[in-house]
Amino acid sequence: MFKKVENKANFPKIEEKILKFWNDNKIFEKSMEQREGCEEFTFYDGPPFATGLPHFGHFVPNTIKDIIPRYQTMKGKYVKRNFGWDTHGLPVEYEVEKKLGISGKYEIENYGIENFNKECKKIVLRYTEEWKNIILRLGRWVDFEKGYKTMDISFMESVWWVFKNLYNKGLIYESYYVLPYSPKLATPLSNFEVNLGEYKEVNDPSLTIKFKIKDKNEYLLAWTTTPWTLPSNLGIAVGKEIEYSKIFDKKKEEILILGSKKINSYFDDENAYTIIEKFKGSQLQGIEYEPIFNYFLEQKDKGAFKVHTADYITTDDGTGIVHIAPFGEEDYRVLKKHTNVDIIDPLDAECKFTNRVKDFKGLFVKDADKKIIENLKLRNFLFKRENYLHRYPFCYRTNYPIIYRPISSWFVNVEKIKTQLLEVNEKINWMPAHLKKGRFGKWLENAKDWAISRNRFWGNPIPIWICSKTGKKICVGSRKELEELSGQKIEDLHKDKIDKITWPSKDGGTFIRTSEVLDCWFESGAMPYASNHYPFANESNFKNIFPADFIAEGLDQTRGWFYTLTILGTSLFENTAFKNVIVNGLVLSSDGRKMSKSFKNYTDPMEVINTFGADALRLYLIMSPVVKADDLKYSDNGVRDVLKNIIIPIWNAYSFFTTYAIIDKFKPTKNLSLVKSNNLDKWIISELESLKKILNKEIDKYNLTKSIESLLEFIDKLNNWYIRRSRRRFWKSENDKDKNDAYETLYYAIKTLMILLAPFIPFITEEIYQNLKTDEDKQSIHLNDYPKANENFIDKTIEEKINLARKITSMARSLRSLHNIKIRMPISTIYVVTKNQNEQNMLIEMQEIILDEINVKEMKIKSNEEELITYKAKANFKELGKKLGKDMKTVSIEISKLKNEDIIKIINGISHEIKVDNAKYYLSLNDIILERDEKDNLKVINEESITIGIDSLITQELYLEGLTREFVRQIQNLRKEKNFDVSDRINLYIENNATLEEILNKFEKYIKTETLALNIILNKSKLEKKINLDNDIFTIIGIEKC
């Protein structure tokens, strides 16, 4: 019936075999086919870029995205799993620029946009085969053949439909705004793209500049950390309520104005200056000053070169006075509020100065700092120069500094729908839950309008055509519409093709498309519609696939994909795009740094899989804090530990069962009975049925952490209690009902556990199932229904009894370990103290098991722990400090003097009076901290409501029995070393030894039974291994098969 199972398994090889089995038998396809026509469970797969290989950061969401669909399929749902590829955008273009050796907008245009886009199309799916191989090797079932690509014309057309819907609702507008801009990519970025990048500590020059007040010999001292913005200065800002001082600088003989609190930052000696007057910033409002550069003098008539009040000014840094240029969001807002100045941006696409700033023409802004400082110093405008250490954003694609500048861009009016966004967020089940009100909720509360246009080439073109004469705009929402407007056949929607599509307007002009392409995050957010070519196809079925039942990605997507899905879902349908989401944290290297090839601080993921197996890696990731959106410091040793402590014990349980089932020719019946008389059988079956309830509940709630914890607890109970305590039932030679019940129970437990584990570790579960399944069973474990609990076999009473016994056992083992008393050394007595009468009754029933487990001769059950210990007390300062005040010290001394009987009264609820002068205080149990002193030879430990004590006195008789148990253990180890089968009978060879002679006189029968030794023989020539029974007691043994 069952195949023989090797004790030592090569799990990576087993997994390769299972992959072949799945592939040869089309198991994934069959799992889908058998659910066709069933209720649909919708899962959206966030599209990755295929311009790089998957890493550990991809493995976490991909494991989660395998577990939930497998589980839902086993629950009877039809779950489409179509992979997607993000094929447009900056990541692709940047890779092509590196490949071609070109950089920036101008060089791309010279190379030719059509040629450039052809290269993008070639490179975009460079690693798709590697992705397929790695994702499938991880054990994830996903359909690559029916996957979508954002560059497909059907996908792009649906994105146009989404855009036009937002446009028609008044949610799309074009405007100048200060935006984060990537000089290397020559395009603006969205706020959440900035957050995807890194903020680095940088040392920038910090300047204090003198601005001369018009018609006066007085200077405003203004501060900046961006010298390159000074040529574009158009104003100065002060704080309305901040106090400023006009001082006379005795050394330079100049009158200066700065924040009163900042004078000491600029003058060490109070005698170096004289304060002329003090006033609020509001008195500076409207004062004119002389520009320090003459590049934009024409703006003077429009309100430039004046002082304005602003609410963001502080005296934390600088002078309390700030220079204003249209390169900061707040600066831009102040200029718009107080002036009519034009939008000034003397920078080209690569953030180099244009001819408008002729003295610094051609210099990249950051490189211009030095020359600008020299210029100001030469003309006596520089008052002070320092360095300023601060965090500055760098582009997430180029690792180059981001520049903030005024840009004409297309926006989604997010602020207009902010209330709806927050309402929609309330419908989403976030896992972990804190993200709803926390990171994601806060991001929505502070959401700004989304800049969706990119001045790039490889992307989905913004479908707006503008009349060259009147400026009239037409937004196009489909190919058909564009064909009707232009009279041309549309075969491709990319920029190099679509920009050629123009048509005459009625006003004598020409409709020409606006030059920008869409932010690729807009496409990702449109994925629910575009991947189904909605509404041009799948319109009737759309209500079944939107919103998604489930999605999963990393924490960074709270400001990426989760955000854009939510914006577009809310904008289109006032609904969430997804109902449930599991968010994982970052996977870092073991040193806490970002994983990097250049740092060489992580092992190649495929090497990990080929060493430990994908199941071990999956389990390691899912068990870790990363599933709760926390960071994980990845370690190969962590995966090794999972293999050792979980995967191998599962295999050992399976190996144990098959070994004895083969010997006894056990054959499972079709209708296996769960009605058992043995309490161990009843208990493990009850625990298994309870586990089913927990898993169905917790996975339905997307709580993978609780699910895994419950599974691991059961594996521990099965291996370390049920199997260990049932061994002799399998060993005995007669095939009675008890032995058959043990076989049936263990068979049912292992097989059912494998089905429960299948979504989590699909390989080992399949391997074990293939050997355990009967002719009536499904072809693959993954074609089974997910097990539901049989309430008739849940017995909470027996669970409580055995779990109490396990708790007492665990406490006793801890106590032994604490006092260096080996488990094989018998102890005369254990005392168990509990006031709970029900627990006392259960302990009486479980007494025999407990004594056997912890190797104790007698158990005494007590109601009061004072029979084992005497008490001392210390003051609980945390509690008493609030009540006693100055009397605390005196009362503390009195508490330390309390007698044992006084403390017992307090424990029993009788308050104890302490007098201090005329005051009386009454102590309760919360007011003291108990200390326990053990009586006589007792060693005591307390855990919650239970206290146990063991008698540590070891008599000679007990000591001899302990040596016997150690002797048996050493023989068993030798059996393993020699690869003897568990059922092999042996001859045991010993030397002439006084201690052994004493042991054999008392325990020969026990030794033979435990080691399957038929004969114990004195024979020096057969001795092979020296063993240590205890400290200096050595002997030599040998064994051979009979």
Swiss-Prot record:
It is an enzyme of class 6 (ligase). GO terms for molecular function: aminoacyl-tRNA deacylase activity; ATP binding; isoleucine-tRNA ligase activity; tRNA binding; zinc ion binding. Pfam families: Anticodon_1 (PF08264), DUF5915 (PF19302), tRNA-synt_1 (PF00133). GO terms for cellular component: cytoplasm. It comes from the Bacteria. Coiled coil: none annotated. It is found in: Cytoplasm. Its main location: cytoplasm. InterPro entries: aa-tRNA-synth_Ia, Anticodon_Ile_ABEc, Ile-tRNA-ligase, Ile-tRNA-ligase_type2, M/V/L/I-tRNA-synth_anticd-bd, Rossmann-like_a/b/a_fold, tRNAsynth_Ia_anticodon-bd, Val/Leu/Ile-tRNA-synth_edit. Monomer. Catalyzes the attachment of isoleucine to tRNA(Ile). As IleRS can inadvertently accommodate and process structurally similar amino acids such as valine, to avoid such errors it has two additional distinct tRNA(Ile)-dependent editing activities. One activity is designated as 'pretransfer' editing and involves the hydrolysis of activated Val-AMP. The other activity is designated 'posttransfer' editing and involves deacylation of mischarged Val-tRNA(Ile). Belongs to the class-I aminoacyl-tRNA synthetase family. IleS type 2 subfamily. This is Isoleucine--tRNA ligase. It comes from Borrelia garinii subsp. bavariensis (strain ATCC BAA-2496 / DSM 23469 / PBi) (Borreliella bavariensis).
